[in-house]
Amino acid sequence: GGVTETSGSTGPAGRDRRTTDRVARHGLPPAARRVHFVGVGGIGMSGIAEMMSGLGYGVSGSDLTASAVTARLRELGIDVKTGHDARWVSGADAVVVSAAVSDDNSEVVEARRRDLPVIPRGAMLAGLARSRSTVAVTGSHGKSTTSSMVAVVLAECGLDPSAVIGARVAAFGSSTRVGQGPHFVVEADESEPSLLELTPQIAVLTNLEDEHLDHYGTFGRLQDTVARFANRVTETGAVVLCADDPELIRLRERILRRVVTYGLDD
């Protein structure tokens, strides 16, 4: 195997402005101290909740069902309720919502009634990444494994990274790591438009297959989203892609950032 590098032309990364103007440091209003997570039982939401607790925010959450994930959050001192109730928004400065949560959820309705920022999970993750040197990993398969390897290598090198991964990392004992270093490793789900909230320094593309067509409709639209994501990389950054994947090789010509390839045959 090997690694090769090419340079592409640079252009505007483009920015998705869907988040509210009130969103500031860490994607939250400057005075925010307590954040409530609706749908906190998912691996992505729980990881962000755990990270924000580690950063010193007061964190609470709710989910329809109790699980091993919600039990772990409780062990960390996070107040997690089972079911949904408007009362649980009381005291929160902002509310983060899972993609699985509908707009008519009682807690979301109450948050809007109180004029609280209601922040999608992807926007919250992007807010956490904003002040860091971010490595974002996406692809149809291998996201958790690859992002875990990147985070563990950075940690073993003494760089003390933060990470939010879509699976438990044995070396961390969690899907999340809160570090003091500048690096932030995230698993970016290509099935969600929130992929385009991120502006990473490095994007890693593992592979691309015709999945998630229930969301995108066509494989072409999925390809478009991944190409847009790659071009959101900072102009001094790089896109690392697997040269063994034919779809990524075809996508490569649409990438305007510096490209580094890897693979068994590369």
Feature annotation, model-predicted:
Residues 1-124, 246:
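N-terminal leader/targeting and accessory segments in enzymes
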Residues 51-54, 74, 88, 99-258:
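Phosphate-binding loop of NTP-binding sites
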